[in-house]
């Protein structure tokens, strides 16, 4: 909505608003906006907003664009609007939620923010990851963008997909555009590959709700933003500052969105990512990287650089549909190492959480002598939680296990175990929310990177180019007697674009541990 326009005669609420303001509705005189007038403020909410809220409107988008001046010197109308909307929304006992423009330092205390009417361009896309994470420096932790760009620019399938990928790993995911019949941001307005890829990522966003909600509580409780620059936890590392578009996405993931075009020869886009100390696993490709350095990631259109730290535990909802209720089927992606995670849940609407009305499920993972152990301490049973919940534990970097044992309250549980797709998945029957669970995998085979030769072959197979030339180069590389010789031959035989791909991402000659 655009409050600066006041209330006009064509609006449904005009007659009631005019009478309340002491005006004759028949004159159709505009009711001018005045945030300093108590009478207008009450009329504004009582006649223009409350009736729609009674019909089901959950929150308002305040699109104020008319500057900082009001009849009261020093009072910014947008600040006042955010303040009054925030207070008014609490009258029903629900949590106040508004979406609004940036009103200066400190204005994060009320709304979810949005970055205005951005152009549809690669340049704008490239700036937004940096903008989002560094906004945390002034406390603005929940920010949103018009995913896909708002106006002008150009229609570009590849750019759209990369923007959607950024949106999925942003605080707020919101497709939006100007009122243009040819600029809709729905996936079906793009080519088949872009549509399918965008759909996949949008579904992933819905699966991530348990993780996002837990991180929201983390922000509330501890002041840690969902998107934080890499230098927050690595202040002495120069690489953390140079990786402008890299950021931690909650406690478990590191993200660096793709913001450059795909190379036509390699069919991938290059992104340079600085990884902190430790082992990092690409959640889309399964490739493992050593930290404390910058790596070059080459992403096809359907992938992007997202890394799980060692010991990461990531909750995902497997419930189908568009519901935001606490899930009945919950999957945890688990990465080997030592780590913990607190899954936070509440009713999602009221302020009962302030009085302790919430449930926290604690999980921890640890590496044992010849396996891995996952422990789950069930949360409180609440009316807003399912009576029983089915858990699925996906050990994402465990290829196989000789045996799996799952216990609850001293009793062994029947479970389904599969090792398809290079990961071990343990599915449990529906259980009470409060039930403790202990899962142990013995004799495990851990995920490893492919041999360098195989990685090079796979990368070169997808390269665009003349087949005979590709084959001649590959046959020379195939004859290399060891990895050092292979590395040397790659540097000599291929051009800069292909060399970067083979050395930094496609063949991943620098990524093995």
Where on the chain are the PLM-derived regions?
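Ordered hydrophobic segments in well-structured contexts
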Residues: 112-113, 248, 254-256, 272, ...
């Amino acid at each position: 909505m655009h409050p600066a326009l006041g209330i006009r005669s064509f609006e449904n609420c005009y007659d009631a608003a005019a009478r309340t303001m002491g005006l004759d509705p028949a004159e159709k005189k505009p009711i001018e906006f005045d945030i300093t007038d108590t009478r207008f403020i009450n009329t504004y909410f009582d006649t223009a907003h409350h009736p729609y809220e009674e019909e089901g409107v959950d929150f308002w988008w305040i699109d104020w664009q008319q500057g900082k001046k009001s009849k009261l010197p020093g009072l910014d109308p947008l600040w006042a609007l955010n303040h009054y909307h925030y207070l008014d929304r609490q009258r029903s006992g629900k949590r106040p939620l508004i979406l609004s423009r940036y009103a200066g330092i400190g204005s994060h205390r009320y709304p979810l923010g949005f970055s205005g009417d951005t152009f549809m361009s690669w340049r704008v896309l490239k700036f937004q990851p940096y903008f989002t994470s560094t906004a945390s420096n002034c406390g603005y932790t929940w920010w949103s963008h018009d995913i896909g760009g708002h106006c002008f620019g150009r229609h570009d399938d590849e750019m759209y997909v990369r923007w959607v990928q950024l949106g999925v790993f942003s605080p707020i995911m919101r497709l939006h555009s100007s009122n243009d019949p040819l600029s809709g941001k729905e996936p079906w307005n793009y080519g088949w590959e872009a549509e399918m890829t965008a759909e996949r990522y949008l579904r992933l966003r819905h699966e991530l709700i348990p993780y996002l909600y837990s991180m929201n509580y983390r922000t509330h409780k501890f002041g840690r933003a969902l998107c934080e620059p890499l230098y927050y936890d690595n202040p002495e590392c120069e690489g953390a500052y140079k990786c402008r578009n890299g950021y931690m996405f909650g406690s478990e993931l590191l993200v660096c969105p793709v913001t450059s075009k795909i190379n036509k020869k390699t069919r991938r886009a290059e992104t340079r990512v600085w990884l902190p100390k430790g082992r990092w696993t690409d959640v889309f490709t399964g490739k493992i990287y050593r930290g404390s350095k910058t790596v070059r990631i080459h992403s096809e259109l359907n992938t992007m650089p997202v890394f799980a730290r060692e010991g990461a535990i990531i909750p995902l909802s497997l419930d189908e549909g568009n519901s935001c209720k606490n899930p009945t089927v919950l999957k945890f992606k688990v990465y080997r190492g030592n780590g913990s995670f607190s899954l936070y849940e509440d009713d999602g609407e009221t302020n009962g959480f302030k009085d302790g009305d919430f449930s926290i499920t604690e999980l921890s993972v640890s590496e044992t002598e010849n396996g891995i152990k996952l422990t789950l301490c069930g949360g409180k049973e609440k009316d807003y939680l399912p009576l029983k919940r089915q858990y699925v534990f996906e050990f994402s970097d465990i290829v196989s296990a000789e045996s799996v044992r799952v216990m609850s309250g001293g009793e062994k549980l029947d479970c389904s175990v599969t090792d398809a797709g290079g990961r071990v998945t343990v599915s449990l029957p529906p259980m009470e929310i409060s039930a403790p669970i202990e899962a142990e995998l013995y004799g495990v085979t851990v995920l490893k990177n492919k041999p360098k030769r195989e990685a090079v072959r796979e990368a070169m197979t997808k390269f665009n180019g003349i087949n005979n030339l590709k084959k001649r180069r590959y046959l020379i590389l195939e004859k290399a007697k060891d990895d050092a010789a292979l590395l040397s031959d790659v540097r000599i035989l291929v051009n800069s674009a292909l060399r970067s791909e083979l050395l930094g991402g496609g063949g991943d000659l620098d990524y093995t541990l």
